[in-house]
UniProtKB/Swiss-Prot annotation:
It catalyses: an N-acyl-L-alpha-aminoacyl-tRNA + H2O = an N-acyl-L-amino acid + a tRNA + H(+). TRNA binds at Y14, F64, N66, N112. Belongs to the PTH family. It comes from Lacticaseibacillus casei (strain BL23) (Lactobacillus casei). This is Peptidyl-tRNA hydrolase. Hydrolyzes ribosome-free peptidyl-tRNAs (with 1 or more amino acids incorporated), which drop off the ribosome during protein synthesis, or as a result of ribosome stalling. It comes from the Bacteria. One of its GO terms (cellular component) is cytoplasm. The keyword Hydrolase applies. The lineage of its organism: Bacteria, Bacillati, Bacillota, Bacilli, Lactobacillales. Pfam families: Pept_tRNA_hydro (PF01195).
Amino acid sequence: MKMIVGLGNPGQKYAGSKHNMGFMVVDGLAKRLNLTIDKLEFDAATATTRLNGEKIFLVKPQTFMNASGRAVRELMMFYQIQLDEIFVVQDDMDLTLGKLRLRKRGSAGGHNGIKDIISATGSDEFCRLKIGIQHPQRQRVVDWVLTPFSKTDQPLIDDAIEKADDALEDWLNGMPFDQLMNKFN
């Protein structure tokens, strides 16, 4: 069993915002797999399929970013998903725009959605795919993450989403995480 969790904020108000990179990536993967993420369960929108004989969950928590842990924990408990079967997709202000970074574990690094998942699960031992949204120059962080990408930045973001979905597909198809890091970091 594998679960891919895209972090973001629900609702049209936040659609396309920098903080919703996780949602955008999971939506792209769902499209590749001909899935619709529309089942509401455990404070999350989900889709399930089977790939290579394994059950796959695509998840978009509907609790707002800073409370994502509850949905992740409840899905883990109900479906008996282990931490090493989870891959969380997030935005990262400390990475240059469009850069991907994969990590096996680690601290939240200031990301409140990750912090809440660590708190809810009691562990930081889950895989992450971080996508750079760049740090704001003079703008307040909260305003920066909740605004959409500029038209000039959008092609770079579209490319990053494609690469992120390539990485997730490779993981779903059994590529070892160390190889994923070598290929996509």
